[in-house]
Curated annotation (Swiss-Prot):
UniProt modified residues of type Phosphoserine: S755, S756
Subcellular location, record wording: Membrane
Keywords: Glycoprotein, Membrane, Phosphoprotein, Signal, Transmembrane, Transmembrane helix
InterPro entries with a match to the protein in the record: ARMH4
Protein name: Armadillo-like helical domain-containing protein 4
Signal sequence annotation: 1-27
Function recorded in the entry: May modulate immune response and may play a role in inflammation. May negatively regulates AKT signaling by modulating the activity of mTORC2 complex through RICTOR interaction.
């Protein structure tokens, strides 16, 4: 028995390695491009990153993948990817070593990542430089080992192994701002969706969302509210801390949550980030736990995520600027995105380094994630490393490896490459991000959502409304970022404009390497459809607009390594929103307002007709709550064309900003056309259902009647035959009896005659 088992294990491992290498190969070209930009933009930082890499290498934590060391992710450019740490499961205290190395660069963020063993890599560095605080540490650790819980120095609680989340540390305040913005937008923080979403294993960490954006602080304040929502799924304290969302606490919380990676090598990224962190700017480290949606610290007050990174960076001033509301509801990953976006251009952070490490962590996460989530896939491992949103925002989008660690190596490689290539966002915003300035709105068509069937796909971007809003923002910006274009990115000009206005410095570029998952971007940005991928296909929808990236929209792309190398805004969102009831409705109707609405209605009519009505009220209530929170958080944003209607299925893309601007109004009524289409779809589905039911009944009446009649006839015939036989039998018996009696009389007569003769 042992021999076949060993053979199967070996085969599975080899296949995973091959998949990872393939994914890495796909990601390489983009990474190199990014690296070039980074080299020009951040030579000084690159040196720092290199030193960090060296430190990280020395202290490398084990990669979650099997024993053989992961491929070195070091990019040719500024950051050598921290070499992939050996895959040993044991988590060496490398974290501490890394931390210290980083600490020399900047206050070390004690980023205890308790990899596989729950051992926290304690960094001897000052606690206050908690991983999140390090700007450079935009690390997205996604080790998924359920066993290990990683505790960031200030973590309220060690992240639970089950909730292995990619931890993303936005290095700069801008990143954090973005994170909060995303949080608000993607998750109306209060909306339960965000919570459930965070929980879903499938959710991808949208590194894109993490893209460090150095947007204005407009969204900053809104973030805390959104942050307040705790994710039910997240085991991490993310849920509790997010509510506080004080800059330090929220940030720290995010970090704590995010450092779920149980796997050994989560931490490796951090050291590099620290060195990058030359600038005091704080990186928010938001790692999203699949189960637990990490909290994205919305409030970047002058203390960046203190809890997470406990870093009080002098540059916090910008933090408000950048804080983006991230909608956590969509994905636990939202926090990650927020983090990356955080940097507004403050200081170059070691985002690149973080990114490098991130990939490794990510891979780790990947493997463990399934365990953590139980049935759920580890896809939520996608780690975003918003690298220093400022100086060197290097964002690597790690997309989760959907199954196990397939993606682990490739993801790591991608992350590392991206980090190297990405240029600091704040400093080089114009260089890198202007091209990227256009926000991509990856609207995954509802058709995508229809594919949601699989447990992984189960993460429907529940936070459709909020997602939509975020995606819409990206739309305004150019549809194509400098070299990349999202396969399914559609730009909504008006919303994009708003977003760009908000996040001008942050041009988030999300590029996804071609992913098996095909997600369709609907032209109407407003309907950011929840993208739900098919059971296995992971939808990786990086969204360039930092505010725009709704975690819900992107799902994991199992084999795609996100090419989001945009230093600034690449963020990978993983969305898992199995808990959301209206995920299905959203998926079925999608947020494609006009184009995909009817088609989607037709597709999902049968399944979700009845659900839509039931869920409408619930969703409306949730939306109202979301809108209120958004109003509070995003006072400056202007109303979108329309906010999502009460019905999730028909939710138009609703930017969080837009929602906020609706201050008195929960949501704007959708256009008459949209209502009409929606109603038509509902009526059509109802009619079809009635016809189907009636036809079934009418068709069954005849055969059933004939069958019953035939059965009765047969029973009657049998009974009649039985009765006839009984009569015949009785008559025969009677006849025999008479005969017998006759015979007996004859006998008696004979006997009498004989006796009489004798007597004579």
């Amino acid at each position: 028995m042992s021999r076949p088992i060993v053979l199967h294990i070996c085969l599975a491992f080899c296949s995973l390695l091959l998949l990872n290498f393939a994914a890495q190969c796909l990601a390489f070209p983009n990474l190199e491009r990014r690296e070039i930009v980074l080299l020009h933009a951040e030579k000084g930082q690159s040196e720092r990153l290199n030193t960090d890499d060296l430190e990280n290498d020395s202290v490398t934590s084990n990669t979650p993948v099997s024993g053989d060391p992961m491929i070195v992710l070091a990019g040719p450019s500024t950051m050598s990817l921290n070499k992939v740490f050996p895959s040993n499961k044991e988590t060496s205290p490398v974290g501490a070593g890394l931390m210290q190395a980083d600490g020399s660069n900047i206050y070390t963020a004690t980023e205890p990542e308790v990899p596989a063993g729950e051992e926290v890599f304690g960094s001897s560095q000052p606690e206050r430089m908690s991983p999140e605080s390090r700007p450079s540490k935009a690390t997205l650790t996604n080790p998924v080992m359920p066993t290990a819980s990683l505790n960031i120095d200030e973590r309220e609680e060690p992240s639970r192994g089950t909730i292995i989340q990619p931890t993303v540390e936005g290095t700069t305040e801008a990143t954090q701002g973005f994170l909060s913005y995303v949080d608000d937008q993607l998750f109306a923080t209060e909306s339960p969706e965000g919570l459930s979403l965070g929980h879903s294993p499938l959710s991808l960490v949208n590194t894109k969302e993490m893209l460090t954006t150095s947007p204005r602080t407009e969204k900053f304040e809104a973030n805390p509210e959104h942050k307040t929502t705790s994710f039910p799924g997240s085991k991490l304290t993310a849920g509790t801390e997010p509510s506080q969302m004080t800059a330090d606490n929220t940030q720290a919380t995010a970090a704590t949550k995010h450092w779920l990676p149980t796997s050994e090598s989560i931490l490796s990224v951090e050291p590099e980030t620290d060195s990058l962190l030359g600038a005091p700017e704080v990186t928010t480290s938001v790692s999203t736990a699949v189960a637990a949606a990490p909290v994205i610290s919305d409030e970047w007050d002058d203390t960046k995520l203190e809890s997470v990174s406990q870093i009080k960076t002098p540059k916090l001033g910008d933090n408000t600027e950048t804080q983006v509301r991230m909608e956590i509801s969509q994905t636990t990953q939202a926090p990650d995105i927020g983090m990356e976006v955080m940097e507004e251009g403050k200081a170059l952070t070691e985002a690149a380094d973080v990114s490098l490490k991130l990939p490794e962590m990510e891979t780790h996460m990947e493997t463990t994630l399934p365990m953590a989530h139980g049935g759920e896939r580890a896809s939520d491992q996608s780690s975003v490393t918003p690298t220093s949103p400022m100086g060197d925002t290097k964002v690597s989008v790690m997309n989760l490896v959907q199954d196990t660690a397939d993606f682990v190596e490739s993801t790591k490689e991608n992350g590392a490459m991206f980090l190297e290539t990405t240029v600091s966002i704040s400093e080089y915003e114009s260089e890198v991000h202007q091209p990227l300035g256009n926000r991509f709105k990856d609207i995954i068509t509802q058709e995508m959502t229809t594919a949601v069937q699989a447990a992984e796909a189960t993460v429907s971007l529940v936070t459709q409304e909020q997602q939509v809003a975020t995606l819409e923002v990206t739309r305004g910006e150019d549809e194509t970022k400098g070299g990349r274009e999202l396969p399914s990115a559609t730009v909504d000009a008006p919303r994009a404009t708003q977003l760009s206005r908000r996040w001008e410095p942050l041009a988030t570029v999300v590029s996804t390497t071609p992913i098996p998952v095909s997600f369709k971007v609907t032209p109407a940005v407003e309907d950011v459809m929840d993208t739900v991928t098919g059971p296995n296909e992971e939808l990786f929808t990086p969204i360039l607009g930092s505010p725009v990236t709704p975690p819900g929209i992107t799902e994991e792309a199992p084999s795609t390594s996100p090419a989001l190398a945009d230093p600034e805004a690449s963020s990978e969102r993983r969305t898992a929103a199995p808990s959301f009831s209206y995920v299905n409705t959203a998926a079925s109707y999608g947020l494609d307002q006009l184009e995909s609405e009817e088609g989607e209605d037709d597709e999902d009519e049968e399944d979700e007709e009845e659900e839509d009505e039931e869920e409408e009220d619930e969703e409306e209530d949730e939306e109202d709550k979301d809108a209120d929170s958004l109003d509070e958080a995003l006072g400056d944003t202007e109303l979108p064309g329309f906010t999502l209607p009460g019905i999730t299925s028909q939710e138009p893309g609703l930017e969080q900003e837009n929602v906020v601007s609706l201050e008195g109004v929960t949501f704007q009524v959708p256009d008459a056309i949209q209502w009409e289409q929606q109603n038509q779809g509902l009526v059509r589905s109802w009619m079809e259902k009635l016809k189907d039911k009636a036809g079934y009944m009418s068709g069954m009446l005849v055969p059933v009647g004939v069958g019953i009649a035939g059965a009765l006839f047969i029973l009657g015939a049998l009974y009649s035959i039985k009765v006839m036989n009984r009569r015949r039998r009785n008559g025969f018996k009677r006849h025999k009896r008479k005969q017998r009696e006759f015979n007996s009389m004859q006998d008696r007569v004979m006997l009498l005659a004989d006796s009489s003769e004798d007597e004579f």
